[in-house]
Regions:
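An N-terminal, well-structured beta->alpha segment
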Residues: 1-51, 55-56, 137-170
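Short, electropositive, low-hydrophobicity segments enriched in small/polar residues
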Residues: 1-8, 39, 46, 68, ...
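N-terminal small/polar loop signature for handling phosphorylated ligands or for N-terminal nucleophile
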Residues: 20-24, 28-95, 185-209
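Gly/Ser/Thr-enriched, mixed-charge loops and adjacent short helices
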Residues: 96-209
Length: 209
């Protein structure tokens, strides 16, 4: 449960340990994308993760509320070193979680995950702290969601041409989750008539119906 088991202090360690391990496998300060769903705890957890990354010297690009597949796609597209999705999938709003993706937009290898877990428990973690100009930087890149919409249009427009008719309507239930920010854009870009429901997230109504 967010802010109970999954505390900001724990999330900070997850991020700092992750930045350390990623740096070991790279010759530069890593750049990490962060995306989240609509849960009320998302901002809290993202803030703690960002602090952990920056404190080690990693750089962060915040994607804001965005579907998990979009984060995976953008990780590879933007040539980021890794990404993090803050979400608890189908669970109700009280829960939240953190998932790392590799630079290929796939789940990080088990051995890297184990390294991160080991470093989280290490007393050495506090010794690795960036100072002065070595501190990481953060920027908001919610605009990158449009790159994902363009990807859909470019790759699926021809396949959906036969459905661009007045008598074909798609109903989409976004469950007040991360898809709520992109469903309208995607189906409009594809030229498909659509009706969207459960599309007004308020932080606590995700997966409610």
């Amino acid at each position: 449960i967010a802010n109970t088991e999954l505390t900001p202090e724990l999330v900070y360690k997850v991020a700092k340990a992750g930045a350390y391990v990623l740096s070991k496998h790279s010759d530069h300060a890593p750049t990490i994308l962060i995306g989240r769903d609509t849960r009320i705890s998302g901002t809290l957890i993202e803030s703690a993760m960002t602090a952990g990354f920056l404190s080690y010297g990693a750089n962060v690009k915040s994607l804001g509320v965005i579907p998990t597949p979009a984060v995976a796609y953008l990780t590879k597209k933007m040539k980021a070193d890794a990404s993090v999705v803050i979400s608890a999938s189908h669970n109700t709003y009280e829960f939240n979680g953190v998932k790392y993706f590799s630079n290929k937009g796939m789940k990080i290898p088990d051995e890297i995950e184990e390294e991160i877990e080991e470093m989280m428990d290490s007393e050495k973690l506090n010794d690795f702290t960036a100072v002065n100009e070595k501190i990481g930087t953060a920027e908001v890149r919610t605009d990158l969601l449009d790159e994902y919409v363009y990807f859909f249009r470019k790759n699926f427009e021809e396949e959906f041409e036969n459905y661009n008719t007045d008598d074909f309507v798609v109903a989409i239930d976004t469950a007040n989750g991360a898809t709520s920010v992109v469903a309208e854009k995607v189906f409009t870009a594809l030229g498909i008539k659509h009706y969207i429901m459960n599309n007004t997230p308020n932080g606590i109504n995700i997966n409610q119906n």
